[in-house]
Regions:
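Short, proline-enriched alpha-helix->beta-strand connector loops that line the catalytic pocket
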Residues: 44-50
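Gly/Ala-rich beta-loop-alpha elbow adjacent to hydrolase catalytic centers
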Residues: 7-11
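Short glycine-enriched nucleophile-adjacent loop
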Residues: 12-23
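C-terminal catalytic histidine-bearing segment of alpha/beta-hydrolase fold enzymes
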Residues: 53, 59, 76-132
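Short, small-residue-biased leader/transition segments that mark boundaries at the very start
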Residues: 1-2
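Short alpha-helix in the alpha/beta-hydrolase fold that links the catalytic acid
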Residues: 61-79
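Alpha/beta-hydrolase-fold catalytic nucleophile elbow
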Residues: 6, 32-33, 53
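A conserved short beta-strand
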Residues: 24-36
Length: 132
């Protein structure tokens, strides 16, 4: 059984805490328009893939918290000796430019990010291609 999880906004904060406690319960985690509030070590030790997606000008969080979490996880993987290509299979940082939203008639990156991201074929392909 493959369990994939998505967390959007406050749900992403909550899900990051779950990932920080028991990431082995999930095949992969997609964090949308949120920030990471959980621990990092167990995620790295379990090798559970994580995909961060957020608008570059997200009105609620901004993109910096996602960048910070990605960099922290990336650093921990490097400390374990993983190559960049191995890390790229486990960790994605996808900061969408404003044009991603405006090309779809959207001006509110945070409020509409969740609905756009779950309809984005490349993001969903990443999520559903992950197996354990």
């Amino acid at each position: 059984v493959y369990k994939r999880q998505e967390g959007y906004s406050g749900g992403g904060e909550t899900m990051s805490r779950v990932m920080g406690m028991q990431p082995e319960l999930y095949t992969a985690y997609l964090q949308c328009s949120s920030q990471w509030d959980g621990a990092y070590d167990k995620v790295v030790n379990s090798r559970t893939p994580v995909y961060f997606v957020i608008g570059e000008k997200d009105e609620y969080y901004g993109s910096e918290p996602s960048r910070k979490a990605y960099n922290e996880l990336h650093s921990l993987y490097r400390q374990q000796g993983l190559s960049d290509s191995d890390i790229d299979k486990l960790l994605v940082l996808d900061i969408k430019p404003t044009s991603y939203f405006t090309s779809k008639g959207i001006t509110n990156q945070h409020g509409y990010g969740g609905s756009l991201f779950v309809r984005d074929e490349s993001i969903m392909n990443w999520l559903f291609a992950k197996v354990r």
